């Protein structure tokens, strides 16, 4: 419970400032996310006669083709820290001009994935953009947090874009490696998914020391409570396959 509280306090300060004037709300509604990718999130369960070793072997085989980096920008597996590797999430991300949903499903089946796990292959295509604090090309993700959130009435993406930039600038100045994925099914939707990717094991220590108790963190925390609410938050060990 304590860890959850720490995560929640930190992540609510990444959201934005919003004016109380209706004119500002109207202008903010014109600011839309600049989506870069198509995304699919598939929730899966390992079958009773299978295990994590089988899944690891399968994924090692998967990266050998036929789908490659030319087809997939990123393919990640999220494993909850709270269970014994019985459930996981596939996160498939491709460029905005590609949609390989059916090719991906077919490749999984052809390589024998059906014997290892069962997934809810939701065909709803999501769109996203990624933001980095610093160059992370040489780093591996240590863990991720997935938050499912919803804007409050009269609030939207435009209300907190400026604060996102300010937050990333702070991460850069502190040299803290961090990545966010902002995901929506539709830019006009009130619902969105926020994925935080952390690249150092002592990330929480860095944040709690330099940010949590600062004036800026508390100020943006209060602003977030006016903008949106997060319905749930889960922590995952993250494996980048492609």
Annotate the PLM regions.
Residues 17-217, 226-242:
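Short S/T/G/P-rich N-terminal loop/turn motif that feeds into the first structured element of a domain
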Residues 1-21:
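Classical Sec-dependent N-terminal signal peptides that target proteins to the secretory pathway
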């Amino acid at each position: 419970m304590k860890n959850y509280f720490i995560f929640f306090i930190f992540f609510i300060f990444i959201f934005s400032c919003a004016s109380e004037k209706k004119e500002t709300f109207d202008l903010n509604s014109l600011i839309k996310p600049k989506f870069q990718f198509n995304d699919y999130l598939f929730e899966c369960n390992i079958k009773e006669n299978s295990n994590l070793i089988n899944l690891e072997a399968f994924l090692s085989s998967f990266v050998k083709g036929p789908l490659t980096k030319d087809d997939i920008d990123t393919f990640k597996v999220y494993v909850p820290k709270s269970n014994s590797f019985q459930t996981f999430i596939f996160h498939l991300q491709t460029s905005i001009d590609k949609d390989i949903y059916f090719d991906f499903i077919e490749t999984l089946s052809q390589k024998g994935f059906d014997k290892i796990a069962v997934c809810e292959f939701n065909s709803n295509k999501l769109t996203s953009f990624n933001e980095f604090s610093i160059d992370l090309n040489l780093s591996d993700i240590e863990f991720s947090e997935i938050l499912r959130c919803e804007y409050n009435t009269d609030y939207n993406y435009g209300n907190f874009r400026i604060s996102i930039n300010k937050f990333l600038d702070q991460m850069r100045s502190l040299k803290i490696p961090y990545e966010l994925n902002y995901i929506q099914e539709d830019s006009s939707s009130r619902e969105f998914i926020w994925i935080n990717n952390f690249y150092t094991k002592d990330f929480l220590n860095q944040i709690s020391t330099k940010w949590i108790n600062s004036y800026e963190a508390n100020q943006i925390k209060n602003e977030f409570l006016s903008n949106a609410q997060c319905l749930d938050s889960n922590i995952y060990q993250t494996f980048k396959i492609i």
